[in-house]
Amino acid sequence: MTNRKGWIVTLAGMGLNLALGILYAWSVFKKQMVAPVDDGGFGWTNQQATLPYTVAIAMFALMMIPAGRLQDKLGPRIVAMTGGLLTAIGLIIASFSSTGSPLPAVIGFGLFAGTGFGLGYAASTPAAIKWFPPEKKGLITGLVVAGFGIAPVYISPLTKVLLGNFGIAMTFRILGIAFAVTATLFSSMIRNPEKPLNVAKPGVSKTSFGGDKTWREMVRTPFFYMIWLQYAFAATAGLMIIGNMASIVTSQSGGALKAQAAMFVALLAIFNAGGRVIAGVLSDYIGRIVTLALVSISQASILLFFPRFTTFGEFIVGAAVVGFSYGACLSIFPSINADTWGTKNMGLNYGVLFTAWGVGGVFGPMLAARIVDATGSYQTAYNVASMLLLVSFVLAMLNYVQVEFDMSQREVTIRLGAKKAIAKVVAAKEEAA
């Protein structure tokens, strides 16, 4: 019965995130908003059209902290439902945007929907994880957050059809009403178990540092800051592409792939979702840090080639690698959080860690928008993001290869991840005279 209830909560969390994932479809709205007024757009600059998305990301990240505390105290159902309703209201407010100012979109999509994203997202993952043993953290986290990643698969083409038939304003209103219904339905099924299932199988460690930690204890560890930086760098690179994918395809193809731009947004979303599930399962077997290092170096490599992409096939490869790598991080980091600092306070703890995603999410899209407005090219932004991911790879390696010194015993111990020592060097003790 417990497993059945746990899977219901997991699928409900995935469903809620499937609705909240409208954030990742913003590039379709942006493409229409920067279009000339004669073509049904607003004639906004890239920076104006990116601003609501950037504000939404910032609010998303900032709200994860109070939302995490609220869901730890009040339970996930109330928090998730409130988040869903705020997102719906925000979409309706955004429908009042016009050629004159992006303010309604900034207030509606940025502030209201961004707050809703944070509340809903903070409630879904911790609740699902608490229903399962530690060795399934990666799988369950991946499944729940996959809903957020795969959302553009249906939202992007749906939004494109709605924009073509009803225009920007009515599209926001239709999506807002639909969102209110679906988010309320899924939120009603999300709840915590009476007691988290923290019993691991023999040989499986419950947490790396032994027991549940508060956020204050968490931020006192050097490991937290290394992980925070890696999360920020991954978000910078991933959201830079996700938030501008339709525009990137249209621009770098010289307009040849303009009609297929929304398809690439959906393709990126498929790999985004796949990365969350596959990397979650993979990290359960080979370790979180190793998986993180692999996706960091993969994404860094592909971004070096992105400026040269102009054809259909090249953009497929680019969308696949970036989507998978970014999605992988969104399941690896919550799992690292639960492994290291426990599940009791995970809502608040992960909210604090999630500020890294917010910083990266604000920096990445706005950097790309500023650069393309100034130079007409994304190349410099790609190079910066690739360098950040290389730093993330190095940090992951430093986390994985640990060297411990015991001066009293004259020992040097080398460890790989959380495994037993692979080498131990003991200095010869001096014989007593």
Show the residue positions of the predicted features.
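C-terminal transmembrane helical hairpin of 12-TM major facilitator-type secondary transporters
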Residues: 237-240, 259-336
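Intracellular juxtamembrane helix-capping segments at the cytosolic ends
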Residues: 33, 119-133, 140, 328-341
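Helix-loop-helix hairpin linking two adjacent transmembrane segments in secondary transporters
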Residues: 144, 148-194
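Central cavity-lining transmembrane alpha-helices of secondary-active solute carriers
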Residues: 51-69, 266-278
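Interfacial helix-cap and linker-helix signal at transmembrane-aqueous boundaries
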Residues: 33-34, 70-71, 154-166, 249-250, ...
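Hydrophobic core of transmembrane alpha-helices in multi-pass small-molecule transporters
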Residues: 102-119, 232, 314-328
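Extracytoplasmic gate region of multi-pass secondary transporters
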Residues: 26-33, 216-279, 364
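C-terminal ends and interior cores of transmembrane alpha-helices
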Residues: 85-99, 298-310
